Every structure is written in C-alpha cells, then in structure tokens.
C-alpha cells in the first residue's frame, strides 16, 4: 500500500491505534463497563438498562448488550438490554435514548464498543489508516444535570459511507458475495462532517440559550484532525476548546466519544460544574449533539 507514517499523521493527525487480536466487541464493552461502574460508585446489580452502540457486534444475534449482561453476571437481574447501530453517531444516539429512559429506570449503562478492524480492507488507504478498536462506557442516573439533545439522519443514497451486508435483492440479482468491508468517499464525508458538526453544535446551543463562550469543552467524534479543525475555524472558536485524542486511538467509531470523555475527565479538563458538548456524525448518514450542563441549567 502506498503510504507512510508521515503521510498518515499529516493527513489525519493519527499516530497510533489499537487493534484487537482475540477480543470481541463484547469483551471490550465488558472491560469498559467495569470501569464505568467503578467510577459511578455503584454495584453491578444497580444497573437497570444496558445499551450498546456498535456496528461490529459479536454476532447477528444475540445482541452485544445481552452478552455484556451475561459477562457482568447479571442474568438473574431484571435488565433491559439492547443494541443500536448509529455507526459513529451510535453512542450519541444511545445516550439520548438513555436520558429519555431515566423517567422509568434509575441506572443506565451506555456503551460504545467497536472492533472495526474486522471490517477494514487493509489494502484500502482511504479507510485502513483511520480506524482502531476500543470501547468506552458511562452510567446515566437521575440528578440535577440538564441535558439538551439534537439528532438527525439522512438516508445515504449515494453510498458515501457504507459496509455491505446481507441483502435479498443482491442475492436475487446474483451479485458477487459481499466483502463486508467499510467503504468511504473521503471528500464527500469531509464536507458532510464539517457541515453537520457545526449545525449540531448550533442546535444545542440555541436550545440551551448558551453560546460557545459558556462551554468548557467540546468532545467531538474523533474522526480526523482536519475535520475537527475546520469546524473550529468555521465557528470562529479556538481549537483548544475541542478535545482530541485521535492521535493515540484513531477513529474508534461509536467508542470514540465515551473514550474521549473519560480521558478528558481524568486529565481534569471537565470541571465539576462544567458544560460539555458531545457531537458526532457517522454512516447512515447520522449526526447529532448533546449538551451536558452540570450547573443544572442555572
């Protein structure tokens, strides 16, 4: 493949990534769950709901969430467990669903987990230099934190970002068997991403009657340095307000936002009463944002 370490870093900002060897998506999700449970200072048995955002499940069925439930030893507990596939927006979608479920459930485990290396063509420079495997998780509970959400989608009729799957239509047409590799039209993705990331941030700011000056940190989907820097430039915001760890992990799809949030917390970049925006985009096409206001809207 015609590439180099220098080319990858200059074009993407990514200098290292992690690739699972024997671990499945549920294994990574389980490890992230243990850390989230410890950080939340709750017991495993306190969990009422498990939502896993992934586009690389261990298998078609059962869901990865049910596999995580079993790994946590919670099969004898009443658990509402399910997966969603919002691609790289998946964690945001799961987070927003979880926040709506808090009126009925007390503790919700939300996980973004991917072993995206399974669906990468390692001879395709447009994708194989970008993606890595990983998982991140959060526990959502009731409290004074105010949340503002925005989510949207546009059916990808132009095959801008997709991976083939099972299709009766394809079978009837006697097409070649699917490779299941992820395919991406890079320039189209770039233009779409810059547009909708800015749009999504502006939506949650308008809902909350806040401005970027009121926001302590923006945690974007860790897709590409150039995408994030262009969004900051278009919004006339200093790039330092956008947290990035893609240089270390690459694009981990649905796992990127919870991994970045956890790292930002550990680095002391999220004040106890801080305001944080999570924003992302992905295949679908999907996109959205959540503003977390730890000042309780005050």
Residue ranges of each PLM-predicted region?
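Glycine/charged-rich beta-loop-alpha catalytic/anionic-binding loops adjacent to active sites
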Residues: 14-15, 46-51, 72-85, 117-123, ...
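Condensing-enzyme catalytic core mediating Claisen C-C bond formation in acyl metabolism
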Residues: 1-22, 124-191, 195, 199, ...
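A contiguous, well-structured pocket-lining segment that forms one wall/lid of small-molecule binding clefts
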Residues: 177-246
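Conserved beta-strand elements of the Class I
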Residues: 48-51, 109, 216, 277
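Claisen-condensing/thiolase-fold acyl-transfer catalytic domains that form or cleave C-C bonds
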Residues: 26, 30-33, 37, 56-57, ...
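Phosphate/pyrophosphate-binding loops at sites that engage ATP/ADP/AMP, CoA/4′-phosphopantetheine
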Residues: 2, 32-48, 199-216, 264-269
């Amino acid at each position: 493949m015609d590439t180099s370490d220098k080319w990858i870093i200059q074009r993407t900002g990514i200098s290292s990534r992690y690739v699972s060897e024997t671990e499945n998506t549920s294994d990574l999700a389980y490890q992230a769950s243990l850390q989230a449970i410890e950080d939340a200072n709750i017991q495993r048995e306190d969990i009422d709901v498990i939502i896993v955002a992934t586009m690389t499940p261990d298998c078609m069925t059962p869901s990865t969430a049910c596999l995580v439930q079993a790994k946590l030893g919670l099969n004898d507990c009443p658990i509402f467990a399910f997966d969603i596939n919002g691609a790289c927006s998946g964690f945001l979608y799961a987070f927003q669903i979880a926040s709506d479920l808090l009126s009925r459930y007390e503790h919700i485990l939300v996980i973004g987990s991917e072993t995206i290396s399974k669906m990468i063509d390692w001879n395709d420079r447009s994708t194989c230099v970008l993606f890595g495997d990983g998982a991140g998780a959060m526990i959502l509970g009731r409290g004074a934190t105010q949340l503002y959400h925005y989510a949207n989608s546009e059916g990808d009729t132009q095959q801008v970002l997709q991976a083939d799957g099972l299709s009766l239509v394809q079978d009837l047409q006697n097409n070649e068997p699917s490779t299941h590799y992820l395919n991406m039209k890079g320039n189209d993705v770039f233009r779409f991403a810059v547009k909708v990331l800015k749009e999504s941030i502006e939506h949650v700011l308008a809902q909350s009657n806040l401005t970027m000056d009121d926001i302590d940190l923006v945690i974007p989907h860790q897709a590409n340095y150039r995408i994030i820097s262009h969004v900051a430039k278009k919004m006339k915001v200093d790039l330092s307000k956008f947290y990035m760890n893609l240089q270390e992990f690459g694009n981990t799809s649905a796992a990127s936002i919870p991994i970045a949030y956890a790292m930002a917390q550990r680095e002391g970049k999220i004040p106890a009463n801080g305001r944080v925006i999570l924003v992302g985009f992905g295949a679908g096409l999907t996109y959205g944002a959540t503003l977390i206001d730890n000042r309780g809207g005050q």
